[in-house]
Regions:
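C-terminal outer-membrane beta-barrel translocator/porin domains of Gram-negative envelope proteins
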Residues: 629, 635-636, 681-870
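Outer-membrane beta-barrel initiation region
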Residues: 475, 480-617, 689-715, 813-824, ...
């Protein structure tokens, strides 16, 4: 609502820089197209919807420009797949495909065309018309031009490169499984099994496969469904086996913090080791069986730690500001290889600032865990990652984006050749030359099998290599991306800096092409006499004497988030509506909302006010409300039901999946019968004839659990439940006493990608002197029909039991009843009582995937869902 951006930091500075730049591009687009406010979308003042490929693609392009991973994705598309149209770019391809389109556009027209396109989209309030006006091409023409560009760019790269399936044995098939990720392989020491992270069921789970055939042995862990495995670290993965092949260690988010899980492969039992760190990633089990190396993030850095299982204690073995990742042990268990952006800073304290350090390039390092000495293994201009130590020879395998493709490298660690008896120069070399790219190699103890994750066919799969130590050096030719870098540099740059201090003397008379005509940008058009381009751009009261920015205390300031309205019609309360306003501060610590209809006097209007204090783990809410409803009871009389009170609630989360809500509410219901009379002037007016009031306090507590996954039309997998207890202790004018417990339980089973079975059970019970009624039957907003009510014939078109004139418990039935629905085939309130139970069963399925009509009109229908229920 406020165009706010929250940045996660997990100890990796390059990742942090990328996220900041990426999200700020979104903020810029939201500000430029939508005025920086969700309200403009809600109120339809901004009718345009920026395509996801245009939005995410630009954020990726401006934050990363172009890199080997993006190049890998598009090379795979150009070679292996049907190239999608721009309208078909969604999901993962919205990011990389959109990034490629922006690279094509800026390469052909210049970066200035980015602003032209978004200005045109905003003027026309149509995304395709915006592109057409700025580029002279509609989406169909843009697709054709982009496809030609992809062919010219990537078809030359095919020559002399090996498709993954030709140079290795494929163990998984993401197309058959209809998933995207099969990553983070961990080969058991004996080479018989491989563990991996996979998203086959829409979650990230850990599976165990046969390392020879790829056949699944078992699903070891279900991720994203429980508190202990709330999140498996798939962005920085790391699975590792114990030396005896019996257990696996994995880092995961469990509730409030990250932990190490040690899982017995046979029994699936898990032991959790809690660590006082902000983040835990990439665990690796030592050959001695007692130590586990992992990446720990604390504050502003990530370091390598070792956890002693026997002592249940962790110690830090690197301690600096640099980003360290992917630790791996040597066969003796006395050295660890890891990835770092430290450059030449291997010993001693780093005295500089990280923003002056090149943290975008990574190399391989080793550290002796006994003396803490760090040695640099690689020193190239390329990025190296995912080291794995050979067990039978002094060699190291790792991946590198050498010449634009992520390949597997071998690096000898000693310069003595046992065959010749001579010393040789240590030289790393590629042992694969793949077409797309590979990552995350893992070795068996005898070094006879190496398994890695490779990208091909718009997805990741596991591949196996035999006898990797015997593989010869490969020649990896540079890609077109690398070759063209020398001529057309694609580095990230500050595109505004040249505009901050233009040399006016160099301008031709009357040329204002580089001027910025906008309020607040006057200084961009003035020459600066000194070399510090930024001095005049910084407000003088923002800096200290040493040049650092002055920290300022945060001040709470409320601004409007959204204004909306609603109109609804009920057979009980008639027509009603309300205008809703919501305010919050920039940090989201405080929230104020109120709504009103204000069509009559204060006494006869609907309104509410709510304040939420959301700064800490516990959320506090305070609400005051009033609803006034009028009913025509006969030709000369109206009934006014006025319901007003206050409510307080505390929401206490225990994890991502469950919370406890508790509080109390104070209710006052005023019943007034208004009779039509004539005043002294002969005018009609209403006069109160009968008045009585209900007043009660209702403490309540609810336990909520929800790990469901939503699809396009609702939950498709998981479990949801809400169990609540409400008590009326008898305080108030009517001494209303009851205790009600109810539970709503829902379970969803996902069958493949398209089918879901849903079961829902509802049960409720009320006891006490004034026990509540449960109304059973009907569905919300569909309440017509004849038949019987509680066994009594009732041929009326509508069931209005709670408004029957002879109903002695009128107010109690309206304001203190519970509804058990949906019960299709029955009318609203067809059964009522103090105990209720309801069971629903549904099968959800794709009804029409695609239907094109030619007569009487050319129309296309698609993605229409259906369900069968009982």
């Amino acid at each position: 609502f406020k165009n706010r951006v929250v940045f996660p930091f997990e100890g990796n500075y390059e990742q942090f820089r990328h996220v900041i730049h990426h999200e700020l591009v979104h903020a810029m687009i939201n500000d430029m197209v939508y005025g920086g406010r969700m309200q403009n979308i809600v109120s339809s003042r901004a009718k345009i919807r920026v395509p996801i490929w245009s939005n995410e693609g630009l954020a990726e392009y401006l934050s990363s420009n172009w890199d080997p991973k993006a190049d890998m994705t598009m090379r795979d598309i150009a070679v292996h797949e049907r190239m999608p149209s721009v309208k078909e770019l969604n999901y993962f391809m919205a990011y990389k495909g959109g990034q490629s389109i922006w690279r094509f556009i800026t390469g052909k027209y210049g970066r200035e065309k980015i602003a032209d396109i978004f200005r045109s989209m905003k003027r026309t309030q149509n995304d395709q018309k915006g592109y057409e006006r700025a580029l002279g091409m509609n989406y169909e023409d843009l697709t054709k031009q982009w496809h030609k560009y992809l062919k010219k760019e990537y078809w030359p790269d095919v020559k002399d490169r090996d498709p993954l399936e030709d140079m290795s044995e494929k163990l998984t098939d993401h197309k058959k499984a209809r998933n995207f990720y099969n990553v983070s392989p961990a080969l058991s020491p004996d080479g018989s099994m491989v563990a991996l992270l996979t998203d086959q069921n829409g979650y990230f789970d850990i599976h165990i496969l046969d390392a020879m055939t790829g056949k699944r042995i078992k699903k070891l862990i279900k991720g994203n469904r429980s508190v202990d495995f709330e999140e498996l670290k798939w962005l920085q993965p790391g699975l590792s086996w114990s030396p005896d092949n019996k257990k696996i260690v994995v880092a995961a988010k469990a509730g409030k913090s990250d932990v190490l899980h040690v899982i017995d492969v046979k029994t699936k039992k898990s032991k959790k080791y809690e660590l006082e760190l902000d983040g835990v990633f990439s665990a690796a089990w030592s050959p001695n069986g007692n130590d586990i190396a992992f990446v720990g993030q604390s504050g502003s850095s990530s370091d390598i730690y070792i956890y002693d299982i026997e002592k249940e204690a962790a110690r830090k073995i690197t301690d600096d500001v640099f980003s360290d990742s992917y630790p791996t042990w040597n066969s003796e268990g006395n050295q660890i290889a890891f990835v770092s952006d430290r450059g030449d800073y291997v010993q001693g304290e780093f005295q500089g600032s990280m923003y002056e350090h090149d943290y975008s390039q990574t190399d391989i390092y080793t550290i002796n865990i006994l003396d803490g000495i760090i040695n640099r293994v690689t020193n190239t201009e390329y990025n190296e990652s995912h080291p794995v130590w050979a067990n039978t020879q002094e060699k190291l395998f790792y991946t590198a984006d050498y010449n634009g493709v992520w390949n597997l490298f071998m690096h000898p660690l000693v310069n003595y050749n046992s065959e010749t008896g001579e010393e040789e120069t240590i030289q790393q070399y590629p042992i694969t030359n793949v077409l797309t790219g590979l990552q995350q190699p893992t070795l068996s103890r005898d070094d006879n099998t190496l398994i890695f994750a490779g990208y091909s066919g718009i997805g990741w799969d596991l591949y196996s290599l035999s006898n990797p130590l015997s593989l010869n050096k490969k020649n990896v030719a540079p890609t077109q991306f690398i070759l063209n870098q020398d001529v057309n540099t694609e580095d990230i740059s500050d595109l505004r800096r040249h505009k901050s201090s233009p040399d006016l003397a160099s301008y031709e008379y009357g040329s204002y092409s580089n001027w910025v005509f906008a309020k607040g940008y006057e200084n961009y058009n003035l020459p600066l006499e000194d070399s510090n381009d930024n001095e005049v751009l910084i407000p003088p009261d923002s800096l200290k004497n040493d040049g650092e920015y002055i920290p300022r205390s945060y001040k709470t300031k409320f601004t409007l988030d959204i204004v909306s309205g609603n109109l609804q019609l009920s057979n009980v309360f008639g027509a009603s509506g309300m205008t809703y306003f919501s305010f919050s501060d920039i940090l989201g610590d405080h929230q104020i909302a109120f709504g009103t209809e204000m069509v009559l006097t204060l006494e006869n209007s609907d309104y509410f006010f709510q304040y939420g204090y959301l700064k800490n783990k516990l959320d506090y809410y305070f609400t005051a409300f009033q609803n006034a409803n009028f009913f025509q009871v006969d030709y000369v009389s109206l009934v006014r039901l006025r319901h007003y009170g206050i409510q307080t609630m505390i929401s206490q989360p225990f994890s991502r999946f469950q919370r406890l809500d508790y509080g109390f509410s104070w209710h006052n219901i005023n019943y007034t019968k208004l009779v039509t009379t004539y005043n002294n002037f002969g005018q009609l007016e209403y006069k109160a004839d009968t008045t009585y009031t209900y007043s009660t306090i209702l403490p309540s507590v609810s336990w909520v659990f929800d790990n469901s996954v939503f699809g396009m039309t609702g939950p498709i997998d998981g479990f949801r439940q809400n169990t609540s207890l409400t008590i009326s202790p008898g305080y108030g004018s009517n001494n209303l006493k009851f205790q009600t417990i109810k539970s709503d339980i829902r379970k969803y089973w996902r069958l493949g990608k398209d089918y879901t079975i849903a079961v829902r059970g509802y049960i409720g019970k009320s006891i006490g002197k004034d026990k509540q009624k449960f109304f059973l039957g009907g569905v919300p907003y569909l309440i017509a029909g004849g038949g019987e009510t509680n066994g009594v014939d009732d041929n009326g078109n509508f069931r209005e039991i709670i408004l029957d004139d002879d109903n002695e418990s009128l107010i109690h039935d309206i304001y203190f009843t519970e509804y058990a629905w949906p019960l299709r085939g029955a009318r609203f309130g067809e059964r009522f009582g103090n105990t209720a139970a309801l069971l629903n069963f549904e099968v959800r399925f794709p009804f029409i995937n695609y239907l094109a009509l030619g007569f009487p009109l050319k129309m296309i229908f698609g993605n229409i869902r259906g369900h069968a229920f009982m």
